[in-house]
Amino acid sequence: MPSASFASTEEDDITDHLVRAMREVKTDPESPGWADFYEVHEQRPQNFADKSGKRRPKMDIEFERNARGPRPRLGFEAKRLGGRHTSNGYLGEEGLAAFLEGYYPTSHGEAGMLGYIQANSVQFWSEKLSAELTDARERHRFVDWYVRPRIQPTARILHFDSQHMTQAGASLRMIHLLLSFH
């Protein structure tokens, strides 16, 4: 997947290409054995007692364990970063806040955010998002870092984890993955 070709691509199109690539890895006979135990879903409707049919929220990407027994799910919401796509979208009600407010359910206290970087650097967005999380702790229900951002100036991918409290008072570990597409 040549990342530069996605510099102005819509969020759903990038997500589609990522999910296709992950599914190709799963079907490759040379893939590691752990790949057999997980399924990846795109735009998967979430089940709620008070929402049904088309009114159910849809998770951009969801990983599900497919072995017998409990089937934990790890959902990711994706947001573009760059130009008119700001950190407000990433952290706001259709991004991080959707997990914190219970709009998106979690099965085991973990969820993720994907940042599709289409302008500026991974370092720029990491610093911006980190500062906004710590400067507005109450708004983002930010508690602490599990894994702090470790910046490498030439990085095209960056991962960090943050700890939050949901509106219901449960601890939530957020996995942040920033991917450069320019």
Positions of predicted regions on the chain:
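Conserved catalytic cores of phosphodiester-cleaving nucleases, focusing on short active-site segments
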Residues: 61-63, 74-82
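Residue-level detector of short, conserved catalytic/binding motifs and their immediate flanks
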Residues: 57-59, 74, 111-112
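Active-site-adjacent loop/helix micro-motif of nuclease/hydrolase catalytic cores
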Residues: 72, 83-94
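Active-site metal-binding core of divalent-cation-utilizing nuclease and nuclease-like domains
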Residues: 36-70
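C-terminal tail/extension regions appended to the core domain(s) of diverse proteins
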Residues: 1-12, 18-34, 85, 89, ...
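Conserved N-terminal substructure of TIR/SEFIR domains
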Residues: 18, 70-72
